[in-house]
């Protein structure tokens, strides 16, 4: 069970093998063996140290998000880290070029999934299928050029061209605005939030597999930037795009440039309903195998 806490004034505790949730209007008790994870989406929530110890013992995550969807903290047991040999392989791959090859394959997968997302959108918007299919074909062509790239700038150039085609097609066929991470419209706020949830999911698997979240291959090194996480999450972004587009963001989703708490909770619940986390775990495992030189990475397909 995914426990989503979206309201102020909630208190989380532990008693007799159960998660105890105290809130206005009553108390809920959930046996801890039924809890998969706790999502805290707002401030004003307290959590007891006794519960933290119990959650750690049962390997249950607690993840905190700010109002924009940024994962700001995560509680997890210290034993949840993989072997150090994976980090060594990760660092060596930066020098041997194996890491760059991984980044190219992930970016290739992202573009192919963008093309697939447009075709799927065309099934929902039959009157626009031709225009969406045409944009999808152009993006697939750009994806086909990535394996021959010799440097990061080449990859980023094709990725940027594909993004322009992709969001232009989405905007023209849905009536939704284009992609602008700094915009305060409901679509972009929801995408930012969804990408934040995705970022957490990939980050979690990177840590579990013993990788360094900050040592990536495409996203530039910067203090505090989880470059590897940003690299690996790229091919999953079209999943978030389709999820948000399907929900049809509207003006009543936001208040003061921030998504309402109930909308944030809905996005988390929709994300968990997609059941993508086992897929993400598999893909991170494939990335580890690639970094060790055991087998070439196989991108995920939408």
Swiss-Prot record:
Function: CRISPR (clustered regularly interspaced short palindromic repeat), is an adaptive immune system that provides protection against mobile genetic elements (viruses, transposable elements and conjugative plasmids). CRISPR clusters contain spacers, sequences complementary to antecedent mobile elements, and target invading nucleic acids. CRISPR clusters are transcribed and processed into CRISPR RNA (crRNA). Acts as a dsDNA endonuclease. Involved in the integration of spacer DNA into the CRISPR cassette.
Pfam families the UniProt entry points to: Cas_Cas1
KW Magnesium (keyword) present: yes
Entry-linked NCBIfam families: cas1
Protein name: CRISPR-associated endonuclease Cas1 1
Quaternary structure note: Homodimer, forms a heterotetramer with a Cas2 homodimer.
Obligatory cofactor(s): Mg(2+); Mn(2+)
MF term (GO), any: DNA binding
Leading EC class: hydrolase
Cited PANTHER family: CRISPR-ASSOCIATED ENDONUCLEASE CAS1 1 (PTHR34353:SF2)
InterPro entries: Cas1, CRISPR-assoc_Cas1, CRISPR-assoc_Cas1_C, CRISPR-assoc_Cas1_N
Organism: Pyrobaculum aerophilum (strain ATCC 51768 / DSM 7523 / JCM 9630 / CIP 104966 / NBRC 100827 / IM2)
Signal sequence annotation: none
UniProt-listed GO biological process terms: CRISPR-cas system; defense response to virus; maintenance of CRISPR repeat elements
